[in-house]
Curated annotation (Swiss-Prot):
This is Dolichyl-diphosphooligosaccharide--protein glycosyltransferase subunit DAD1. The chain crosses the membrane at residues 32-52, 56-76, 95-115. One of its GO terms (biological process) is protein N-linked glycosylation. Pathway: Protein modification; protein glycosylation. Belongs to the DAD/OST2 family. It comes from Betula pendula. The gene is DAD1.
Length: 115
């Protein structure tokens, strides 16, 4: 039974790899940006666990900045994806402008939180 589970897992990984190979390059760049933002948030959490969280506002601001940016990038990816039927009428330039404006608002709130 473990052998069939291993084969199923390998088949699943192979099918995911082949499906992702067909993804347009602009979506792959957004995916890379999301991975970078989440990785940066993880580094901040590990640093806080090792060193401590003396300026807790700074830690929360950095973490919320990374997570908020990743969420906004995922929203951008959903809107820019041509296969998504819900956002067919939305131009990619409009989606990017929304992303930039929301990022600006997010970071203004975070800077205000820092004090």
């Amino acid at each position: 039974m473990a052998r069939s589970t291993s084969k199923d897992a390998q088949a699943l990984i192979q099918s995911l790899r082949s499906a992702y190979a067909a993804t347009p390059s602009n979506l792959k760049i957004i995916d890379l940006y999301v991975v970078f933002a989440v990785f940066t948030a993880l580094i901040q959490v590990v640093y806080m666990a090792i060193v401590g969280s003396f300026p807790f506002n700074a830690f929360l601001s950095g973490l919320l900045s990374c997570i908020g940016t990743a969420v906004l990038a995922v929203c951008l990816r959903i809107q820019v994806n041509k296969e998504n039927k819900e956002f067919k009428d939305l131009a990619p330039e409009r989606a990017f402008a929304d992303f930039v404006l929301c990022n600006l608002v997010l970071h203004l709130v975070i800077m205000n939180f820092l004090g």
